[in-house]
Amino acid sequence: MAAKPGSTKPSGKDSNKSKPLSSASKVSKKAAKRPPPKEVKSKARTEASQLKKKKKREYTEEELDLPKLNAITPVGVVKPKGKKKGKVFVDDQEGMATILAMVNAEKEGQIESKLQKARQLEEIREAKRKEAEARQAQKKNKLEETKAAIRQKRKRKGDSNEDTKTDTTATQPNGSSSKSKGKRKSVSFA
């Protein structure tokens, strides 16, 4: 492996080491032949298969387990149109009267129980109010007693002070009474 004249590059194995990418880029892989992608066309809405409505399965009442309401309309009773569903029709007046009596009795019982509860609550409120009033009266009495006791103490102290003052003023002359009020130290500056 002779080097080309005028070339400064090293020859042989050294050139491969310096350019590893150039040798790798020359190697080409065989591209796998793939068929071209097929276009999926959406069917028009007017096509017969889309226009045809599919039959939905209809369930029987037994399969659905629905409660039976107004299954039989009694003879002589005409259902008024436009009224709510779920009404119970009674074929005889006696049955209707018994049902009404039962419902009224229940309602009256509920009303009575409500009245009883209201009475009980009112009694409880009244008792609480009386207790609160009694507590307030006790507080007032206690306050009045303490006030009276304080007044009595003041009177006792005042009486004893007045007695002692009169005694001291009567026995001592006027000049010495000022000294007896309190021991004051006086400082005079010359």
From Swiss-Prot:
Keywords: Coiled coil, mRNA transport, Nucleus, Ribosome biogenesis, Transport
Gene: loc1
Alphabetical GO biological process terms: intracellular mRNA localization; mRNA transport; ribosomal large subunit biogenesis
Intracellular or extracellular location(s): Nucleus, Nucleolus
Protein name from the UniProt record: 60S ribosomal subunit assembly/export protein loc1
Recorded coiled-coil stretches: 103-159
Gene Ontology CC entries for this record: nucleolus; preribosome, large subunit precursor
Family membership noted in the UniProt record: Belongs to the LOC1 family.
Feature: compositional bias, Basic and acidic residues: 36-46, 127-148
Primary location group: nucleus
Quaternary state and interactors: Component of the 66S pre-ribosomal particle.
Signal peptide: none
Function: Required for efficient assembly and nuclear export of the 60S ribosomal subunit.
Region (Disordered): 1-67, 127-190
Organism: Aspergillus oryzae (strain ATCC 42149 / RIB 40) (Yellow koji mold)
Biased composition annotated in UniProt, kind: Basic residues: 180-190
Organism ancestry: Eukaryota, Fungi, Dikarya, Ascomycota, Pezizomycotina
Molecular function GO terms recorded: mRNA binding
